[in-house]
């Protein structure tokens, strides 16, 4: 398949790059790339993949656009809030490059559909942020022989790697045979993220996809070496460090044929990724250990402990509340109040406050309750002028 006159004009500036050239462009045109997740990573990656001229670009995302996404998910706009993210992204991408076929898959990726979707593509970009989905993407891609470009970003840092390169490189399970404890996994809704940081990682993912598909890593003068790139946006200077990673694990349960335990049949019929990866159980209190925001509002001067991180507390908080971040509270064996004090505990959503109450009871503070729904519910039911972030 050759290029049209329009394509020569559109892609001319990258055609003359020595490392890329005409054959690189033709390879992109003949390739089908799937981006799982049209969020902070997926949006910039999609823009550059479509701009570069991949023949077919697929988008998997069942979520809808929220106004809190817009500072970093730059394909979406105020006008597309509440629209499916994959459809919102397609609207903008079609304007950017009408020569690219854009397919949308408005579903939650699952063992029931991952193989059917992935079989339509040649390379996968993992732009998700949950361990369960990362393992599913990895396992499906490995069993189909697909390369995965994997990225992530949180707060001011990001990382990037290429998995199962050319069906010979190490996979996600080679590096992480077992999932991390649920308590150690922080989503950007909890830990925060700066838009440019996640944007840089998404752009880097697109570049690696271009390099893989155009054949750069298969050149005689280039030897692919598994790597992990770590980006830091803060400090005196921005930094990007790249580390060589080990090759395939001889004990891997999916990419090593000799030790393979995970097959397509196992994934589609037996393996529950959400259960295997675990999930934080926040429903740890009895009904009488919880109160509504209306009940809290009825108290004249409650002893109110806000267990959010200090950065969040400084954004907005209820008057007369005391800030003791959950991580600090877990290491405390006493408070500056008598054990019989009635203590109300609040957080952002009503999850961490339950864990805090459980700890307080374990150190002797029996008269403590958490506030259901946290400050978010307070804004909805009590004070609509209280900011939600």
Swiss-Prot record:
SUPFAM superfamilies attached to this UniProt entry: Activating enzymes of the ubiquitin-like proteins
EC number: 2.7.7.80, 2.8.1.11
Cofactor(s) needed for function: Zn(2+)
Protein's pathway: tRNA modification; 5-methoxycarbonylmethyl-2-thiouridine-tRNA biosynthesis; Cofactor biosynthesis; molybdopterin biosynthesis
Membrane among keywords: no
Reaction catalysis annotation: [molybdopterin-synthase sulfur-carrier protein]-C-terminal Gly-Gly + ATP + H(+) = [molybdopterin-synthase sulfur-carrier protein]-C-terminal Gly-Gly-AMP + diphosphate; [molybdopterin-synthase sulfur-carrier protein]-C-terminal Gly-Gly-AMP + S-sulfanyl-L-cysteinyl-[cysteine desulfurase] + AH2 = [molybdopterin-synthase sulfur-carrier protein]-C-terminal-Gly-aminoethanethioate + L-cysteinyl-[cysteine desulfurase] + A + AMP + 2 H(+)
Top-level division of the source organism's lineage: Eukaryota
Enzyme category, top tier: transferase
Residues engaged in binding ATP: 40, 61, 68-72, 85, 129-130
Cofactor note (record): Binds 1 zinc ion per subunit.
Domain Rhodanese: from-to ranges: 298-387
PROSITE patterns according to UniProt: RHODANESE_3
Entry-linked SMART domains: RHOD
Sorted UniProt keywords: ATP-binding, Cytoplasm, Metal-binding, Molybdenum cofactor biosynthesis, Multifunctional enzyme, Nucleotide-binding, Nucleotidyltransferase, Transferase, tRNA processing, Ubl conjugation pathway, Zinc
The keyword Nucleotidyltransferase is annotated on this UniProt entry: yes
Compartmental location: Cytoplasm, Cytosol
Active site as annotated: 188 (glycyl thioester intermediate), 347 (cysteine persulfide intermediate)
One Gene Ontology molecular-function label: metal ion binding
Family the entry assigns: In the N-terminal section; belongs to the HesA/MoeB/ThiF family. UBA4 subfamily.
Function: Plays a central role in 2-thiolation of mcm(5)S(2)U at tRNA wobble positions of cytosolic tRNA(Lys), tRNA(Glu) and tRNA(Gln). Also essential during biosynthesis of the molybdenum cofactor. Acts by mediating the C-terminal thiocarboxylation of sulfur carriers URM1 and CNX5/MOCS2A. Its N-terminus first activates urm1 and mocs2a as acyl-adenylates (-COAMP), then the persulfide sulfur on the catalytic cysteine is transferred to URM1 and CNX5/MOCS2A to form thiocarboxylation (-COSH) of their C-terminus.
HAMAP family, alphabetized: MOCS3_Uba4
Name listed for the protein in its UniProt record: Adenylyltransferase and sulfurtransferase uba4
Organism from which the protein derives: Ogataea parapolymorpha (strain ATCC 26012 / BCRC 20466 / JCM 22074 / NRRL Y-7560 / DL-1) (Yeast)
Taxonomic lineage: Eukaryota, Fungi, Dikarya, Ascomycota, Saccharomycotina
Name of the gene this protein is made from: UBA4
């Amino acid at each position: 398949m050759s290029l049209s006159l329009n394509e020569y004009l559109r892609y001319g500036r990258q055609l003359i790059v020595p490392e890329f050239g005409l054959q690189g462009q033709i390879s992109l045109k003949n390739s089908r790339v799937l981006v799982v997740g049209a969020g902070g990573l997926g949006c910039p990656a999609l823009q550059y993949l479509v701009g570069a001229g991949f023949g077919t670009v697929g988008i998997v995302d069942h979520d809808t656009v929220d106004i809190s996404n817009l500072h970093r998910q730059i394909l979406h706009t105020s006008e597309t809030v509440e629209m499916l993210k994959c459809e919102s992204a397609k609207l903008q991408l079609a304007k950017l490059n009408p020569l690219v076929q854009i397919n949308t898959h408005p579903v939650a990726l699952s063992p029931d559909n991952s193989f059917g979707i992935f079989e339509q593509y040649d390379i996968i970009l993992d732009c998700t942020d949950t361990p369960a989905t990362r393992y599913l993407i990895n396992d499906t891609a490995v069993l189909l022989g697909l390369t995965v470009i994997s990225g992530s970003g949180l707060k001011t840092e990001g990382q990037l790697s290429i998995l199962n390169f050319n069906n010979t490189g190490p996979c996600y399970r080679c590096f992480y045979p077992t999932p991390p404890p649920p308590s150690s996994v922080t989503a950007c809704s909890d830990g925060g993220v700066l838009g440019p940081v996640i944007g840089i990682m998404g752009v880097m993912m697109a570049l690696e996809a271009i390099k893989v598909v155009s054949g750069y890593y298969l050149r005689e003068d280039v030897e692919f070496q598994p790597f992990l790139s770590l980006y830091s946006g803060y400090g005196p200077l921005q930094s990007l460090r790249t580390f060589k990673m080990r090759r395939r694990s001889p004990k891997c349960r999916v990419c090593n044929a000799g030790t393979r335990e995970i097959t397509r049949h196992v994934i589609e019929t037996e393996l529950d990724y959400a259960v295997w990866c675990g999930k934080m159980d926040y429903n740890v209190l009895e009904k009488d250990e919880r109160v509504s925001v209306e009940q809290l509002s009825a108290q004249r001067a409650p002893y109110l402990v806000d267990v959010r991180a200090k950065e969040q507390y400084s954004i907005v908080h209820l008057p007369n509340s005391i800030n003791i971040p959950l991580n600090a509270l877990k290491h405390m064996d006493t408070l500056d109040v008598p054990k019989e004090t009635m203590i109300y505990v609040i957080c952002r959503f009503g999850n961490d406050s339950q864990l805090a109450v459980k700890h307080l009871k374990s150190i002797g503070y029996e008269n403590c309750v958490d506030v259901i729904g946290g400050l978010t519910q307070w804004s909805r039911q009590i004070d609509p002028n209280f900011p939600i972030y």
